[in-house]
């Protein structure tokens, strides 16, 4: 019974990109996640609140390592896709400045499940977050930076062994009048800092709402 529940691919959220949110992670990687010890021992029964306790203990991001073992980061991302928290809760995850791996996890979730305009509006301010992160690959653990991870989420096709859904560029969205053009670099920096400040101002609401 426990093994059946661990392999439950359903999601509590609505379809994202015309599929179950959990199916945004490929079948092979999904199978490896639900077969992993971390998933079975640390992810079973998590909700939007208790997942935070796991996420703040993360020491690196990444997809798979060693003999194609899924990282704790990718297991929690899959659990997040199962839980499918409300957008306000994801914003609260992003608003806690001291927990950079939680912020990276929430940013990844946004990229996978939110619409193109929301992705740009939510992730672009994080390009001003230059803190160091560790990333685990097949052969090593190396340093990267949160802004570089966010840039990859906005521009790359594959991040942490996950193929990202198509994302229209900022320029395309501006041409469609769905996004306002970016202002000058100094104004843009001020706007980004203001957006991050707004995110962080929600920090006090986390305990009340998740």
UniProtKB/Swiss-Prot annotation:
UniProt key word Nucleus: yes
State where it is primarily located: nucleus
Q: Where in the cell is it found?
A: Nucleus
Q: Which domain of life is it from?
A: Eukaryota
Q: Which Pfam families match?
A: PRP38 (PF03371)
Q: Identify the keywords attached in UniProt to this record, alphabetized.
A: mRNA processing, mRNA splicing, Nucleus, Ribonucleoprotein, Spliceosome
Q: Where is the signal peptide?
A: none
Keyword Ribonucleoprotein found: yes
- Renumbered to this chain, the Basic and acidic residues biased-composition regions fall at 195-210
Q: Name one GO cellular component term.
A: precatalytic spliceosome
Q: Return one Gene Ontology term, BP aspect.
A: mRNA cis splicing, via spliceosome
Q: Which InterPro entries match?
A: PRP38
Q: Report the function annotation for this chain.
A: Required for pre-mRNA splicing and maintenance of stable U6 small nuclear RNA levels. Implicated in the formation of stable and biologically active snRNP structures. As part of the U4/U6.U5 tri-snRNP particle, dispensible for spliceosome assembly, but required for conformational changes, which result in U4 snRNA release and the subsequent catalytic activation of the spliceosome.
How is the quaternary structure described? Answer: Component of the 25S U4/U6.U5 tri-snRNP particle, a subcomplex of the spliceosome.
Name of the featured protein: Pre-mRNA-splicing factor 38
The source organism is Schizosaccharomyces pombe (strain 972 / ATCC 24843) (Fission yeast)
